[in-house]
Amino acid sequence: MKIIRFGVSMPEDLLEKFDTIMEEKGYANRSEAIRDLVRDFIVRHEWEEGDKEVAGTITIVYNHDEADVVKELLDMQHDYVNEIISSLHVHMDEHNCLEVIVVKGKGSRVKTIAERLISLKGVKHGKLVMTTTGKELV
């Protein structure tokens, strides 16, 4: 892979903050940190397009005592068998459960799945985190 060198201009204060954070995170140099920022920018664009294949996790916390939440969660996971790769179930306490669902598919479809799961009655909190499949990322 050919590497291209280019210059970046920015205010000194901004660069100082960037350098501080870069060091805290353990980057060896600015180039590595900037490459990660550019990759993240590309991945976010893929999500926004909606037609690119993405991967991600849907994390939900729910009260398993709530009427039909467990049945609905399982039914929905079977409805999206092509996109839902795996799930992890954790008992947080005697009433609350944490479910981490690993998904892969078109961004728009993954968002729809997350919205449906998170909006179920009995779900106390939910979050979708999407990333790239890595196929189109350099």
UniProtKB/Swiss-Prot annotation:
UniProt-listed GO biological process terms: response to nickel cation
InterPro entries xrefs: Acetolactate_synth/TF_NikR_C, ACT-like_dom_sf, Arc_rbn_hlx_hlx, CopG, CopG/NikR_regulator, Ni_resp_reg_NikR, Ribbon_hlx_hlx, TF_NikR_Ni-bd_C
Details of cofactor binding: Binds 1 nickel ion per subunit.
Chain positions recorded as Ni(2+) binding sites: 78, 89, 91, 97
The UniProt record lists the keyword Hydrolase: no
Cofactors required: Ni(2+)
Annotated GO MF terms: DNA binding; DNA-binding transcription factor activity; nickel cation binding
Gene3D superfamilies: ACT-like. Chain A, domain 2 (3.30.70.1150), Met repressor-like (1.10.1220.10)
Superkingdom of the organism of origin: Archaea
Key words, A-Z: DNA-binding, Metal-binding, Nickel, Transcription, Transcription regulation
PANTHER family: NICKEL-RESPONSIVE REGULATOR (PTHR34719:SF2)
HAMAP family: NikR (MF_00476)
Family designation: Belongs to the transcriptional regulatory CopG/NikR family.
Function of the protein: Transcriptional regulator.
Protein name stated in the entry: Putative nickel-responsive regulator
